[in-house]
Amino acid sequence: MATTTAPSRQLTQKEADIQMMLAADVHLGTKNCNFQMERYIFKRRNDGIYIINLGKTWDKLNLAARIIVAIENSQDIIVQSARPYGQRAVLKFAQYTGAHAIAGRHTPGTFTNQLQTSFSEPRLLILTDPRTDHQPIKEAALGNIPTIAFCDTDSPMNYVDIGIPANNKGKHSIGCLFWLLARMVLQMRGTIRPGLKWDVMVDLFFYREPEEAKQPEEDEVAAPDYAIADFNVSAIPSDGQWPAAIDQPWNDAVPQPIPAVPAVNWAAPEAVAGDWGEAVPPPQQIPTAGIESVPATGWE
């Protein structure tokens, strides 16, 4: 009996994104679980690691993208990451979506102290880790700023309005999440047509070691040229015969000898220009003819 193979079905956008998240270890949680994150847990492995339901992760990413698109001015959105693995992803996300990025340590009072030069009042705050970025979350709560954060299984959910369940500790996971969120935002804005592949690779959102960034720069530096200089070897005939000018006499080319230094009699007495014992003549007085004496003013 002949067996017929079913044609390969093309994956939907959601299925392709979930496969990418699986490859980036977005589904791996921690050994601890917050009670508010239990609804996003798929199962628990034998080693104690909680597995996150990526279907709910994709739905939360879609919801967060809709909220970002609803804000007219992109500069009113602040995306922030104090974790080193998320700083490059934050900068790339801000580059493609037009948001304002804060990569590094948060300055206390940025959202509450109006006397600071870096004071700002955003309409939306996007964070990488609620535990690491606890200071901006508290300030956003005081200023009634909605907050979107990537939450791991052990992340606190206090003052987080939209928590996206995902692994927020891996460099590949964070880069993949920000890449998916940026692509969804651009698709909803109409910059990217739905169903078409985004020409920006996800690797650009990944964290890079400082040594890896310096290596291409060192390779681009041109090595010094230590090759032997060209001394016009082509001028020498290939038949081995030297030109006739070499056979000419060389007498005229010999330089004249340097004349000898005249002999000096060092025993002769040294001639003295004058007698040092003579008296020095007295100084001569300069005539003051024509110069009138200045009358006394009485100030002395």
UniProtKB/Swiss-Prot annotation:
Cell location: Cytoplasm
Pfam families associated with the record: Ribosomal_S2 (PF00318)
UniProt-annotated stretches for the region Disordered: 275-300
Claim: Ribonucleoprotein is one of the keywords in the record: yes
A GO-annotated cellular component: cytosolic small ribosomal subunit
CDD domains registered for this protein in UniProt: RPS2
InterPro entries the record matches: Ribosomal_uS2, Ribosomal_uS2_CS, Ribosomal_uS2_euk, Ribosomal_uS2_euk/arc, Ribosomal_uS2_flav_dom_sf
Chain's role: Required for the assembly and/or stability of the 40S ribosomal subunit. Required for the processing of the 20S rRNA-precursor to mature 18S rRNA in a late step of the maturation of 40S ribosomal subunits.
Name by which UniProt lists this protein: Small ribosomal subunit protein uS2
Species of the source: Cicer arietinum
